[in-house]
Swiss-Prot record:
Its EC number is 7.4.2.8. InterPro entries: Helicase_ATP-bd, Helicase_C-like, P-loop_NTPase, SEC_C_motif, SecA, SecA_DEAD, SecA_motor_DEAD, SecA_preprotein_X-link_dom. May bind 1 zinc ion per subunit. ATP binds at residues 87, 105-109, 512. This is Protein translocase subunit SecA.
Length: 911
């Protein structure tokens, strides 16, 4: 009740924050005259002065006004660009660990230099995170002269970079790179076999460009390092032959069946489910194909893998469409990012879905993979001491930024007021009517000589629009994931008079459409241009620029609404940069996917009530409100999915922290001899307790079993039965002491043979390998647990609580297994005298060979089961590990040494 009145009196929280920061802006401006008077050398010397003042106890906040003034003056001298006052507010927002929402053309890259310079003074490093390698390299090289003028070093990290070059990049004051590369390097560091192999320092401060893309759109995409799993390509091909024989079961709203079939599709949740008839039919077909034994159920425990393949095939055929969710290029399935319209090379779908699509498209089927290490962007970026970001569209997701990352969103006022006119949506009954109206709007704008940008949601729609324009004889350019190599050239001239560009939401980010075209691109196309040529190009551009402004600026036409309001706002934001005129209009039809799935009934009834005829459009605030409500519904659902995935991953994340802390402590330790001694005692106590229960009678002791376990786990044969027969005073406690003494003596002899230093090095390498191998198996087990845990809901149990309880139990088992397997391997190993330096060099070579065969790619975030709000076969970043070509035994076969253990848990650890 009083909220509107209070807001009117005191302003919104955002307005109050801006007012607060304007006071600091005044202080920065007061320094300007003093900075102008400094020579280049004196200005550069300010960096050393600031570092000295920090060392003496001053804080970054105290340095901020003068440091910002130094950065602004350096920007003027080096880049020819002076930070506006609103850009100073943006810099303060980033420094305070918030998200700065700035409109297109407001100079986000320049804003970043203020907070980056200030925080780099601490010497702890600053990471500038971008969405792709091109932007990382472009921004780093663009701003490098400014930072180097101020005495700071700049590094760029990228995939396939030589290790020494990458370490140097991370050691720089400021490091540019992509979110994927920073995340993968974190995982690589936690698989290193020595401190020298690590890349990253402490995760101090990160500035994320296009922060909504990385922290929201990419939040469901795990980063995974993986090893190759068994080959199932033949099974995918067989299943792919069967799927087209299944038909869809369709029911009307009243429950009337209009088409009997085998499966149903839920478009809202993007799920496909077999019905009873479908189960029976697929079981019969699998039996005929020899894939399922006669009379067996597809739901038998040992057939669940086959069921997964069937569902992967169904999803591939019914939910994933070529030129919509993916394209086929050079014999590979390339996924399309629904948010940017760009392809995502290297990113693969999980749970066999990518292989099923490859089978559907008759491509070579790549092997599945097994997870070795993983994290999510949500958990990785929360590791930074301070996090901030910039984007043109964050306010609609402010709640999520605050609730998950603890980041507040600050809307930075524009340097010039917005002059763009955003028209109401026009809604038509059919898609054909909508496209006809779009063509008419294009013709009208082109008569005036206005540049037009037509935004589409998919490649399919962009190509359909292109075909319609060709029939009309209208010249245009198409920008989508198929023609991405022409992006720079197309965008450079998209603002020229009469230019018509059809684009997917590729054109929504990292691009500025300049009215009149881009004169700098024209100059760059010339070989050794003269001053006269440059002046002429500028003069011609100025005329074109003025001509476009007089006709009304860039007109943006959208062929449909996206699920996210942010993407719609990004498309609108291409027009009206820095106070330029412009306009935007969305054209919709009841056949659009968003309208059909989420908003059509209400709007359709409204249109019927108005008695609308074919070709007529409705332009009403009620319709726009209904669409926005539908978008909010989708955004809310997607937020629930991301939040749910985070809640599950938080469980794994706590375990990940423990394992990585243990691993880093091992790497940092010079000698882990005491750790091994402690492990040996704990494993021995546990082994004895299995066969001699505490406080039990001798008649209850399993002596034969204990002797066998000691031979298996400690590689030592001890006559325990004989000892007991010969010594009446040997009871439980003294027996434990005697066994520990015997085992310790045997290991001491091994130390004498191998040499103390060599064995200590070997112990560390073995413990690291055991830890990595068991952690990999644990991740796989956790993955299986997560996929099936939703079924506990049917037993009236809370799936999340059940997952936490079971994962804790699995983690306790993991910690015990690490100790047990390490001691088993060290006990069984046969040592020979070797020069310590040679031993260390050999182990290092083996570790490097292991690392060199790892693959790093993006796959898809695993779902949480179809009953939950999730997307199975979502994307995920994956990397693969080595497979030994000379390995004669299978990893799950009994070890050759006779221990009775699987090869992977015995001598497979050493080899």
């Amino acid at each position: 009740m009083f909220a509107p009145l209070l807001k009117k009196l005191f302003g919104s929280k955002n307005e109050r924050e801006v007012k607060r920061m304007l006071k600091t802006v005044s202080i920065v401006n007061a320094f300007e005259e003093k900075m102008v008077a400094l020579s280049d050398e004196q200005l550069r010397g300010k960096t050393a002065e600031f570092k000295e003042r920090l060392a003496k106890g001053e804080t970054l906040d105290q340095l901020l006004p003068e440091a910002f003034a130094v950065a602004r003056e350096a920007g003027k001298r080096v880049m020819g660009m002076r930070h506006f006052d609103v850009q100073l507010i943006g810099g303060m927002t980033l420094h305070e660990g918030m998200i700065a929402e700035m409109r297109t053309g407001e100079g986000k890259t320049l804003v970043g230099t203020l907070a980056v310079y200030l925080n780099a003074l601490s010497g702890k490093g600053v990471h500038v995170v971008t969405v792709n390698d091109y932007l990382a390299r472009r921004d780093a090289n663009w701003m490098r002269p400014l930072y180097e003028f101020l005495g700071l070093s700049v590094g760029i990290v990228s995939a396939f970079q030589p290790p020494e070059e990458k370490r140097a990049a991370y050691a720089a004051d400021i490091t540019y790179g992509t979110n994927n590369e920073f995340g993968f390097d974190y995982l690589r560091d936690n698989m290193a076999f020595s401190q020298d192999e690590k890349f990253q320092r402490e995760l101090n401060f990160a500035v994320i460009d296009e922060v909504d893309s990385i922290l929201i759109d990419e939040a469901r995409t795990p980063l995974i390092i993986s090893g190759q799993a068994e080959d199932s390509s033949k099974l995918y091909i067989e299943i792919n032959r069967l799927i087209p024989r299944l038909t869809q079961h369709i029911e009307e709203v009243e429950g009337q069946v209009t088409q009997e079939g085998h499966f149903t599709i839920d478009e809202k949740s993007r799920q496909v489910e077999l019905n009873e008839a479908g189960h029976q039919f697929i079981e019969e077909m699998l039996a005929q194909a020899g894939l399922l034994a006669e009379g067996e159920s597809l739901y038998s425990a040992h057939n669940l893998g086959l069921l997964t393949h069937v569902y992967a095939g169904l999803r591939a055929h019914k939910l994933f469409h070529r030129n919509v969710e993916y394209i086929v290029q050079d014999g590979q399935v390339l996924l399309i990012d629904e948010h940017t319209g760009r392809t995502m090379p290297g990113r693969r779908l999980s749970e066999g879905l990518h292989q099923a699509i490859e089978a559907k498209e008759n491509l070579n089927i790549q092997a599945e993979s097994q997870t070795l290490a993983s994290t999510t962007f949500q958990n990785y970026f929360r590791l930074y001491t301070k996090l901030s970001g910039m984007t043109g569209t964050a306010d609609t997701e402010a709640f999520e930024f605050q609730s998950i990352y603890g980041l507040n969103v600050m809307v930075i006022p524009p340097n010039k007021p917005l002059a763009r006119k955003d028209y109401n949506d026009l809604v038509y009954l059919t898609a054909d009517e909508k496209y006809a109206a779009i063509i008419a709007d294009i013709k009208e704008s082109m008569k005036l000589g206005r540049p037009v940008l037509v935004g589409t949601a998919t490649i399919e729609t962009s190509e359909h629009m292109s075909n319609l324009l060709k029939k009309e004889g209208i010249d245009h350019k198409v920008l989508n994931a198929k023609y991405h190599e022409k992006e720079a050239e197309i965008i450079a001239q998209a603002g020229a008079p009469g230019a018509l560009t059809i684009a997917t939401n590729m054109a929504g980010r990292g691009t500025d459409i300049l009215l009149g075209g881009n004169w700098e691109a024209e100059v760059a196309a010339l070989e050794n241009p003269t001053a006269e040529q440059i002046a002429q190009i500028k003069a011609d551009w100025q005329k074109r620029h003025q001509q476009v402004i007089e006709t009304g600026g860039l007109h943006v036409i959208a062929s449909e609404r996206h699920e996210s309001r942010r993407i719609d706002n990004q498309l609108r934001g291409r027009s009206g940069r820095q106070g330029d005129p412009g306009s935007s209009r969305f054209y919709l039809s009841l056949e659009d996917s968003l309208m059909r799935i989420f908003a059509s009934d209400r709007v359709k009834n409204f249109m019927k009530a108005l008695g609308m005829q074919s070709g007529e459009a409705i332009e009403h605030r009620m319709v726009t409100n209904a669409i926005e409500k539908a978008q909010r519904k989708v955004e809310g659902r997607n937020f629930d999915i991301r939040k749910q995935l985070l809640e599950y991953d938080d469980v794994a994340n706590e375990q990940r922290k423990v394992i990585y802390h243990m691993r880093n402590s091992l790497l940092a330790a010079e000698n882990i001899g005491d750790t091994i001694v402690e492990f040996r005692k704990e494993v021995l106590d546990a082994t004895i307790s299995q066969h001699i229960p505490p406080q039990s009678l001798p008649e209850q002791w399993d002596v034969a079993g204990l002797e066998a376990s000691l031979a298996s786990d400690f590689a030592i044969k001890l006559p325990i039965r004989q000892w007991l027969d010969e010594d009446d005073h040997l009871y439980e406690e003294t027996l434990r002491e005697k066994l520990l003494s015997e085992i310790t003596t045997a290991y001491t002899e091994k130390e004498d043979q191998a040499g103390l230093e060599a064995l200590r090095t070997f112990e560390k390498q073995i413990l690291l390998r055991v830890l990595d191998d068991l952690w990999k198996d644990h991740l796989s087990t956790m993955d299986h647990l997560r996929h099936g845990i939703h079924l506990r809901g049917y037993a009236q149990k809370n799936p999340k609580q059940e997952y936490k309880r079971e994962s804790f139990s699995l983690f306790q088992e993991l910690l015990e297994s690490i100790k047990r397997d390490t001691i088993r391997v060290l006990s069984h190993v046969q040592v020979r005298r070797e020069d310590p330096a040679e031993e260390e060099a050999r182990l290092r070579r083996e570790a490097e060979e292991l690392a060199s065969r790892m693959q790093f790619q993006h796959a898809a975030a695993p779902g949480l089961g179809s009953e939950q709000l999730s997307e199975e076969g979502a994307e995920v970043a994956v990397a693969s590990a080595p497979v030994r070509n000379d390995q004669k035994l299978g990893r799950n076969e009994p070890c050759w040494c006779g221990s009775g253990k699987k090869f992977k848990h015995c001598h497979g650890q050493i080899e």
